[in-house]
């Protein structure tokens, strides 16, 4: 889908709605895993998910950052109309994907070091070790899926993956229920189900691309890829990866602080995070749309469309954030019972609901989701990294000041502080770039 011409409401909706729907279904994976674990296993298993969330955030954010960057480069290549440029960009991205998969396998072998880094409580480590090993070893399946997804997004094709995400949710549900509910497996089975589901989606995406978009899979030999392409991908993906890594580092610092609290509170955070991630998913995909649209218009040399589309994305962002906040405050107890189960102790569900009600208040104003993607597509890599540094600093303040003084509520206030501060800085940086007409490279 081409966003370099005049604004078309129908085309915009056809691109955006499937994109948000697909991400919602993707996030249902984590919610289902949490719900099944909460229903079928004890609070210790739920605490393992919560305690490991900081480490898994690092893995997930590094992968997401690289592939967001790859998607921007692919979108810029598509916008340029240069077939050879598109082929060499995809080829380089494919080779980077293989390297990232290998790094995930290596990280899985060092699981004891990972648990030390994450400050995993000793009583949780026997169950946490296989859970982390499977999660990191499955990075290759996640990477293959993400590469094919951003390749489709670069040409504006979001419909198929939206439908495929429904199948993925069903497959993940069946596997989790089978492994944990029927076969009585441990918490590691939740990670295994997610890895298998991602592998299935990657295979189906590859089949679709071979049928409908075979030209997108054209590759070039390693020697035929210019050094500038390697560097542009590394710079683009690396900037977002560094940003995401800094955000994940902040999450890890915050999680280390939370892991000093009672196991029931660690479990409460796991419940709250599963709902928070699902609720903010549509807004996250507005950020993806910002990257795709900005990247295409940078490639086409049409900067005016960037502002036109960005204004529309901002309005949608506020509306979705207010809707999520209203949902949590009005029917939050019912949502919590649905995920945790009616028999879950209020020592877990009560703090989880309070945490969610505090953090959701910042949803309508978390504009950094939009700004960081637009800045990256405009080649403002320093600004992207600066946003990440700010979030780490805010998380450190939370872990070292707010949590020791306010307990579990301090961790929720830390999220509000981090997201709010990065939104303010992101707005300043974006307006400066657009007002100054800073040049950007495709």
Predicted stretch roles:
Residues 1-16, 74-140, 174, 180-238, ...:
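Short alpha-helical transmembrane segments in multi-pass integral membrane proteins
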Residues 19-72, 135-142, 231, 237-296, ...:
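Transmembrane helix-bundle signature of multi-pass secondary active exporters and lipid flippases
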Residues 31, 40-43, 77-80, 154-155, ...:
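Helix-loop interface residues and adjacent transmembrane-helix termini in multi-pass membrane transporters
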Residues 31-35, 113, 147-151, 173-178, ...:
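Alpha-helical transmembrane segments of multipass membrane proteins
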Residues 31-34, 333-334, 379:
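Non-cytoplasmic
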Residues 46-105, 109, 142-161, 268-327, ...:
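Small-residue-rich hydrophobic transmembrane alpha-helices
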Residues 67, 134-153, 161-172, 190-205, ...:
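Short runs within selected transmembrane alpha-helices of multi-pass transporters and secretion channels
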């Amino acid at each position: 889908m081409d966003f370099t011409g005049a604004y078309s409401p129908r085309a915009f909706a056809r691109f955006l709605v499937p994109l948000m729907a697909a991400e919602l279904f993707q996030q249902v994976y984590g919610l289902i895993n949490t719900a099944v674990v909460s229903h079928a296993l004890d609070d210790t298993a739920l605490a393992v998910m919560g305690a490991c969330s900081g480490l898994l955030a690092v893995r997930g954010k590094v992968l997401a950052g690289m592939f967001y960057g790859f998607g921007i480069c692919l979108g810029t290549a598509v916008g340029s109309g240069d077939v050879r440029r598109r082929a060499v960009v995809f080829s380089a991205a494919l080779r980077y994907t293989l390297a990232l998969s290998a790094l995930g396998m290596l990280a899985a072998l060092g699981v004891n070091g990972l648990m030390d880094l994450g400050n995993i409580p000793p009583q949780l480590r026997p169950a946490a070790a296989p859970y982390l090993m499977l999660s990191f070893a499955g990075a290759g399946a996640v990477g293959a899926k993400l590469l094919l997804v951003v390749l489709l997004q670069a040409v504006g094709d979001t419909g198929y993956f939206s439908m495929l995400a429904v199948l993925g949710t069903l497959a993940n549900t069946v596997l989790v229920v089978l492994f944990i509910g029927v076969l009585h497996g441990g918490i590691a089975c939740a990670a295994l189900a997610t890895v298998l589901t991602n592998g299935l989606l990657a295979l189906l995406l590859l089949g679709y691309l071979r049928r409908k978009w075979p030209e997108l899979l054209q590759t070039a030999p390693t020697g035929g890829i210019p050094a500038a392409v390697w560097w542009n991908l590394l710079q683009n993906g690396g900037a977002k990866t560094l940003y995401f890594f800094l955000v994940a580092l902040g999450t890890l610092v915050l999680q280390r602080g939370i892991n000093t609290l009672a196991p029931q509170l660690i479990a409460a955070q796991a419940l709250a995070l599963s709902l928070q991630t699902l609720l903010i998913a549509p807004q996250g995909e507005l950020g993806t749309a910002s990257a795709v649209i900005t990247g295409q218009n940078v490639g086409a040399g049409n900067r005016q469309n960037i502002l036109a589309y960005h204004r529309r994305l901002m309005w949608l962002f506020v509306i979705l954030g207010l809707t999520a906040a209203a949902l949590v405050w009005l029917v939050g107890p019912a949502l919590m019972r649905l995920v945790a189960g009616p028999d879950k102790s209020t020592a877990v569900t009560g703090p989880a609901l309070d945490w969610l009600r505090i953090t959701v208040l910042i949803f309508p104003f978390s504009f950094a989701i939009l700004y960081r993607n637009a800045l990256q597509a405009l080649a403002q890599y320093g600004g992207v990294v600066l946003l990440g540094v700010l979030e780490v600093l805010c998380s450190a303040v939370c872990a070292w000041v707010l949590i020791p003084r306010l307990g579990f509520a301090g961790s929720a206030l830390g999220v509000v502080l981090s997201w709010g501060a990065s939104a303010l800085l992101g707005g300043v940086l974006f307006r400066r770039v657009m007002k100054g007409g800073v040049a950007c490279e495709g």
